[in-house]
Amino acid sequence: MTKLPRTIRLDPSDTFIFEQAAEPGEWAVSGSFAFLDREPSMLTRKERTALRSGFLGLRSYGWSTLCVVVEASDEERAEAVDQLAVYLREAHGAPSQELAMMAAEEEIAFAESLCQHPVQTILAVQRDVEETGEIRERFRTLHARDRSGDPDPLHANLRAFTIVEKAGESADPIDEVDLQAFLKTDKT
C-alpha cells in the first residue's frame, strides 16, 4: 500500500480555466514534463494556467488545480504507471514502450514523494519558468481551519462572511433605511 495524489474538484472553476479539466478522482502527477519542449510565450492562456498551477490527471489527461492524498494499492499504482506510459508514447512521442515505462515510473515515484502527508491532505502546485527555461515547482498543502470551538461546526467552513460585533456598537439593528434621503445627500 502506498499513497498517491488523486484529482479533486471543490468547485467548477477547473472547467473554465483549463483547456481540458481532469475529472475528480483521477490519479495525478505533477505533469510539468508536458511543457518542457514548449515556449511559454507561445502557450494559450489556458495552457499557461495549466503550466502555472495544474496537476495532470491520468485518465482524461486534463488538468486539476488541486489533488488530495489518498491510499493506493500496488495494483492501482501499477495502473497509474501504465496509463502515464501510454500518454508519454501517444502524446509526447516516447521512442519506445520501455523508455515510456521508465519515465512513467519516475513520475509516479515523484508523485508518491508528494504524498508523505496524512491521507485527505490537499495539495496545490505553483510553477514558474526561470529565465534559463527551467521550470521551478513549489508544492503546498491546504488544511481546513480549526472550527472545533465553533457553535455550528458542521457549517462553519461554508460561511462566506462572518459577522462580528464590535465593542461599543449598538446591538440593535437598524429597522429602516431612508434611501431618498441618502440619494439627496451631497456627494462632493
Where are these regions (language model features)?
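Short, surface-exposed acidic
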Residues: 90-105
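Short acidic alpha-helix initiation/capping motifs at coil-to-helix transition points
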Residues: 76-84
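Short alpha-helix boundary/capping elements
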Residues: 59, 92-93, 108-116
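Alpha-helical oligomerization segments
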Residues: 110-120, 128-188
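N-terminal accessory interaction module
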Residues: 1-63, 155-181
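Extended, non-catalytic structural segments that build the interaction scaffolds
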Residues: 63-76
